[in-house]
Curated annotation (Swiss-Prot):
Cytoplasmic topological intervals: 1117-1274
Sorted UniProt keywords: Calcium, Calcium transport, Glycoprotein, Ion transport, Membrane, Repeat, Signal, Transmembrane, Transmembrane helix, Transport
Composition-biased stretches (Polar residues): 1196-1215
Record flagged with keyword Cytoplasm: no
Name this protein carries in UniProt: VWFA and cache domain-containing protein 1
Lineage summary: Eukaryota, Metazoa, Chordata, Craniata, Vertebrata
Signal peptide: 1-35
Gene Ontology MF: a single term: voltage-gated calcium channel activity
Organism: Homo sapiens (Human)
Entry GO terms, CC: voltage-gated calcium channel complex
Membrane topology field: Single-pass type I membrane protein
Length: 1274
């Protein structure tokens, strides 16, 4: 880049005399051009590439390992979707059959007990609320204290003392079921008389009665037919506040009693009729009662206020019938559907025209119902006014329910009889759950004795996601109640979740309506605590012609179909599975089968042409290698030590078998490992005789363990000989079946799955290339690390076309990468980093090395920092380069967002430089590092300049969700996913987006016994205190060069080297993110003192130059126009201000009045942006994005504009807490409600099970902006 000669400084000084300014400008330009001619970014990229290859070959052992895998003998396997889908469907059917057998067995016992009850009454009660704690103990399967020997009961208010209760007869049967069936959770019997019996017994926090008969599971089991329901709330002038509150509470109870198989609408009526405005489709159609629709309807009901106008009853019924009719016309009508209108009203008509109003209402009902063959039932609930009963009003409401139109002189239009409903009185003492919540008892009981399968929901009592299998119990025609079994979803879906046949195939499971239960885009059920959005499979498989495939899947019990898909309209994770990327189209093969005796359909998808899967033939273990399982805590390893926070050993690598290595992944995850089990694994895996029985591992796992053992000698040698050991955290190799070999050998969390980590996925997506990932916070305690990973292939002839049999990875400290940059590219350090900056970014635009990532006064978390965030000038320019970067969209259904992200072209030839004319303040060069997924860039900033990249400070919301331009600079961000609640379909624009790849899963640190921790020494002692020079300390394991005092601003007179925990990030006493997930010292305020005016000297000089030389006038004019174009991009342009980005998650910022040295490093991050004060918002809004578990962190969003904040105003209403909650056996549990984020509704970004507490502080930003608030009707 532009190396400035020493004479330049004096030339610049003389240039202040206007007559010489132009000469200086020309001279500088010529000198700069000459310097750039001497410098080649392509040569520097080659230097970096050589270093990367050396690291991969020497430190990681990629070349050696590939040579070893080339020598193995393989058997070839071609995927056959048709045969495999039948085998997999059979396994899933067997699981369901086990639970159906449990349900049928429990049903038989209940029905037999009732026969006995008739002669010898069974009425004994074991109240769940009074069980002594001594009878229970903690059970990991239920994640709470239970008794595995007895059941207990919860009672409704209406239960009489003689009610049938088979609970004690059931105990032995329920206990046997629990012992013999893995994955089983709660079992229960819910009686029609109001007794809820649950096993195992658990002590509830009881504040009142418990009405299980108004819960969705009970309702959908005793009335399995679909229900179309319209609820009308009367809020006219004659309805008092007390009556209106009763009506609102009753409507909430109805909402909580129905599920996704039903359709619902809520209307309010006074002089006009209103529908919920939170989705436009509610005005026209009924909507499936998903949790999202129920939440919106609940919000609408809560907002209803009394009206001053009289009630027009007829208008309400007219709209209700219209909704039902339009829904029937729009969808495939099912013959057994029950249609019901529920009217919550005082029944008062106007005094002047009472009879006319009544007649008009009955006439509307008569006419409209005749269009629907008199199939709609009307239920009316009379709202009492302080105990005073109006007989005329009650009679009117009864006539409405019974549709007595003849009484008012309205002739019947049809010969078909009407379905008479009922009228019930409600007052303040009414138990709404027992009355309104049981509205379904008016509907016909068709005595359908079939198992009902619920969709997945959260187990509020225990942990994880569950689904319920339930059946009704009858004695003759008498309904006794229902029996149900809650099944762990992770167990049911384990064969789908861990399906691993080849990289080119995957599987999904849907129900017979098309709802998706499991798909590769979704996180493993074991780690979820909230269900993903119930979404149709067509949105996951969003490729041309899939709609036809979907129709066939839902209509044919068995079949297969192949469709051709153009590459340019494909899914990103399909592209990753292709190996012949030159073709314009590829084939996708779908093979499916209905899982017998259930409502589920399994499908296997194969991307063609696929690479044949090569499986290792029987191998023997390396004689010199020792097989050591990772459970060092169970094995009592004498050579154990601490590798930062992890229990570890330097004696040899350890083997970790993740859940995917086991035939039953769920069983492995849910049961504790014992020493005996570990010994069995070790004996089997190291057995060359093949005589020891398999302890439940997949067939190919032993060969993978033995194959990876060949790397042991290489790593052990490097540990002794390598000069880079002080920078290397760990080395590891992982196989597709989840075998992980790691050195130093370390204790890992059993839920860890290497095949779902970013370093593994990046390597698989870039076969044969060196992939860079990070930086991210190492869960083992090593601070921020960067990973180099590389694939190992079965084929030796052409790396990129071989089947991937393993991925190798090595973790370096973050600062080591910047050290490499400084050492190999001297130009980066020639002016102390003040004007010339170097960086490395990977193919999604995230920075791996950059001055601000290692600067102690940058203060930002260094994860997920994007080039748009740190180098907005460069980002703005490279977006204009054709075919280099593409801004992509994808739909994320697990958190209901549209994600925006970048993908850079890794086949870039040559280098990139400034494209936009006039960008003289900032020159850059960018080139791909050959053989990697990364790019190296150099920026030479000769004067202050402004650029705009839209980045939110508080969350990940995009500035403008209504449009996305390829050449507009913005940080990776997200928008709410707009779904038509009535059809479940996406809006047309978002329907074109592919579904996102799976989210990165959090990694959990496995805690070890504190006593053991104190007794162990550190495996690696970096002797930080003995490192006296910055160069000896920089990037070394567990060491930090302490440069800044504890106030976060003052430079130390004598910097020194210390352990990381003493001055994390180079700041004395800074809190480690391992303590509280915050790297902050304290809250700080950005004031207007920090806002600098833009320089105007060059502009004045340009004008003078115009006067002197006509030829250069054009140049100066263009320069001036360019400067203004930058300034006009911001609301702050009038003040010529810029606010430097600040990362709020860390609650601190450096001042711009720091030393000249600091300004040089940081000044490149200046944006034009509007930053507003958001301390009034609840920290819940931030937690939706920042309160992540483990290492998952998405901290790269630093500038927010007020338009974004007002575009998505927050709703402060609490979501509807009553959903499908079989596991929630106490409505009074102290459960956390989901945080509210305006546009994202009640969905969290990740619903992970293990959550770490995160501190949240209020943030105060002050800048000269005007914010317009927007009121939202919630």
């Amino acid at each position: 880049m532009a190396r400035q000669p020493e004479e330049e400084e004096t030339a610049v000084a003389r240039a202040r005399r206007p007559p010489l300014w132009l000469l200086c400008l020309v001279a500088c330009w010529l000198l700069g051009a000459g310097a750039e001619a001497d410098f080649s970014i392509l040569d520097e990229a080659q230097v970096l590439a050589s270093q990367m290859r050396r690291l991969a070959a020497e430190e990681l052992g990629v070349v050696t390992m590939q040579r070893i895998f080339n020598s193995f003998v393989y058997t070839e396997k071609i995927s056959n979707g048709e045969s495999e889908v039948q085998q997999l469907a059979k396994k899933i059917r067997e699981k369901f059959n086990r639970y159906l057998d449990v349900v049928n067995r429990n049903k038989q016992v209940v029905e037999a007990s009732y026969t006995a009850h008739l002669t010898s009454p069974l009425t004994a009660i074991q109240d769940c609320c009074t069980i002594p704690p001594s009878m229970m103990e903690f059970d990991g399967n239920f994640n709470t204290n239970v008794s595995r020997t007895i059941s207990c009961d919860r009672l409704s208010t209406t239960v009489n003392s003689r009610a049938f209760n088979p609970g004690r007869d059931l105990n032995s049967v329920l206990a046997d079921n629990l012992k013999s069936n893995p994955g089983i959770k709660w079992q229960y019997f819910s009686s029609e008389e109001g007794i809820f019996t649950v096993f195992p017994a658990h002590k509830f926090r009881c504040k009142g009665s418990y009405e299980h008969r108004s819960r969705p599971i009970y309702v959908s089991t005793v009335r399995p037919q679909s229900k179309h329901i319209v609820v009308i709330l009367d809020h006219g002038a004659s309805v008092t506040d007390t009556q209106l509150q009763i009506a609102k509470d009753a409507a909430q109870v109805i909402l909580s009693a129905i599920d996704e198989h039903d359709k619902i609408s809520v209307l309010t009526v006074a002089d006009t009729v209103r529908t919920c405005s939170l989705d436009q489709c509610y005005k026209t159609f009924l909507s499936p009662a998903t949790s999202e629709t129920k939440r919106k309807m609940s919000t609408f009901v809560s907002s209803v206020k009394s009206s001053d106008s009289p009630t027009q009853h007829a208008v309400g019924f007219q709209k209700a019938f219209q909704l039902i009719r339009s829904t029937n016309n729009n969808t495939k009508f099912q013959a057994n559907t029950d249609m019901v209108i529920i009217y919550l009203s005082a029944g008062i008509t106007s005094k002047d025209s009472s009879e006319e109003d009544k007649k008009a209402t009955l006439q509307v009902i008569n006419e409209e119902n005749s269009f629907l063959n008199n199939s709609v039932m009307i239920l009316t609930y009379a709202l009492m006014n302080d105990g005073v009963t109006g007989l005329k009003e009650l009679a009117f409401l009864r006539d409405l329910a019974e549709q007595n139109s003849g009484k008012y002189g309205v002739p019947d239009r049809m010969a078909l009889p009407v379905i008479k409903g009922s009228m019930m009185v409600l007052n303040q003492l009414s138990n709404l759950e027992t009355t309104v919540g049981r509205f379904y008892t008016n509907l016909p009981n068709r005595m359908i004795d079939e198992a009902v399968f619920s969709l997945p929901f959260s187990d509020e009592m225990g942990d994880g996601l569950i689904m319920t299998v339930s059946k009704p119990c009858y004695f003759g025609n008498l309904l006794l109640g229902i029996v149900g079994v809650d099944v762990n979803l992770a167990y049911i879906l384990e064969d789908v979740t861990y399906y691993q046949d080849s990289l080119a195939s995957y599987t999904f499971l849907i129900d017979d309506k098309g709802y998706t239960l499991m798909h590769p885009s979704l996180t493993r059920p074991y780690l979820l605590s909230e269900p993903p959005l119930h979404t149709d499979i067509i949105h996951y498989e969003n490729i041309p012609k899939f709609e036809l495939v979907r129709q066939n899947i839902l209509s044919l019990p068995l079949g297969s179909q192949i469709i051709a898909v153009p590459v340019n309209s494909s899914l990103s994770w399909h592209i990753n599975k292709l190996r012949e990327t030159g073709k314009e189209a590829y084939n996708v093969s779908y093979a499916w089968k209905m899982v017998q005796d259930t409502s589920f359909i399994l499908c296997i998808v194969v991307i063609q042409p696929e690479i044949p899967v090569k499986q290792l033939k029987n191998l023997n273990t390396v004689p010199s290698s020792k097989l050591l399982y990772h459970r060092l805590d169970l094995l009592g390893q004498p050579s154990a030590c601490l590798h930062f926070k992890q229990l570890a050993t330097l004696e040899s690598p350890t083997i970790m078998l993740s859940a995917g290595s086991f035939s039953s992944p769920y069983e492995h995850l849910s049961q504790p490992e014992t020493k005996r089990m570990v010994e069995h694994y070790t004996a089997y895996l190291s057995d060359n005789t093949r005589l020891i029985a398999n302890p439940g591992l997949k067939f190919s796992v032993r060969n993978e363990v033995m194959a990876t053992s060949h790397v042991t000698d290489e790593w052990m040698t490097q540990m002794e000989m390598s000069s880079l050991n002080t920078y290397i955290v760990r080395r590891y190799i992982a196989t597709p079946n989840g075998v992980l070999r790691i050195y130093p050998g370390s204790l890992m969390d059993k839920a860890f799955d290497p095949t779902r980590r970013q370093w593994y996925l990046h390597a698989v997506a870039n076969p044969g290339l060196i992939s860079l990932t990070g930086p991210y916070l190492d869960v083992g305690g090593a601070g921020y690390v960067v990973t180099i990973s590389h694939t190992i292939h079965s084929s030796s002839t052409q790396l990129s076309s071989g089947h991937t049999v393993a991925v190798m990875g090595i973790d370096f400290t973050l600062r080591y990468f910047y050290k490499v940059l400084m050492d190999l590219l001297p130009v980066c350090n020639q002016d102390g980093g003040n004007k010339i900056r170097c960086f490395i970014m990977e193919d999604r635009g995230y920075l791996v090395a950059h001055p601000t990532l290692i600067d102690p006064k940058g203060h930002a978390p260094v994860e997920q920092q994007h080039i748009t965030h740190k180098e907005p000038l460069v980002a703005n320019d490279i977006l204009n380069h054709p075919n280099f970067v593409k801004k992509n969209l994808c739909n994320s259904f697990s958190d209901r967002t549209v994600q925006r992200f970048y993908k850079f072209n890794t086949s870039l030839a040559g280098d990139l430089t400034n494209l936009v004319h006039g960008s003289h303040c900032s020159k850059y060069r960018l080139a791909r590092i050959p053989g990697t997924n990364a790019f190296v860039g150099i920026v030479n900033e000769t004067c202050d300049s402004l650029a705009f990249c839209a980045c939110s400070m508080v969350d990940r919301l995009c500035l403008n969700c209504h449009r996305m331009e390829q050449n507009e600079c913005e940080c990776p961000c997200e928008c709410p996913l707009e779904v038509n609640e009535c059809t479940g379909n996406l809006t047309n624009a978002e329907n074109r987006n592919p579904s996102c790849e799976v989210h990165q899963e959090p990694v959990t640190y496995t805690a070890i016994d504190p006593g053991l921790q104190d007794a162990l020494h550190q495996c690696v002692n970096s002797r930080c205190s003995q490192r006296l020079e910055s160069g000896d300390c920089f990037g070394v394991l567990d060491c930090e060069w302490c440069m800044v005092d504890s106030d976060g601003k003052t430079h130390l007179d004598k910097p020194y080297c210390a352990p990381q925990k003493e001055c994390f990030g180079g700041i004395v006493g800074a809190k480690s993110p391992y303590v509280d997930d915050m790297g902050a010292i304290g809250d700080e305020v950005i004031t207007l003192n920090m806002i600098k005016s833009a320089p105007v000297g060059p502009v004045a000089g340009g004008i003078m130059g115009c006067i002197m030389v006509l030829v250069l006038a054009v140049y100066a004019y263009r320069h001036q126009i360019h400067r203004r174009s930058h300034q006009h991009m911001s609301p702050l342009a009038a003040q010529e201000m810029s606010v430097r980005m600040s990362n709020l998650e860390n609650d601190r910022d450096e001042r711009d009045d720091d030393s000249h040295e600091d300004r040089g490093i940081i000044s490149n991050t200046r944006f034009i942006a509007a930053v507003i004060e958001r301390h009034a918002h609840s920290p819940e809004r931030r937690r939706r994005y920042w309160g992540r578990s483990g290492t998952e962190s998405d901290h790269g969003y630093s500038t927010m504009s007020p338009q974004e904040d007002s575009e998505n105003p927050p709703c402060n209403n609490d979501p509807l807490s009553a959903g499908v909650d079989v596991g929630n056996h106490d409505e009074d549990l102290d459960l956390d409600t989901p945080p509210q984020t305006a546009a994202l509704l009640s969905h969290k970004f990740h619903h992970y099970r293990s959550h770490h507490p995160t501190l949240h502080h209020s943030h105060h930003l002050q800048a000269a902006v005007t914010v317009h608030t927007v009121d939202a009707e919630c």
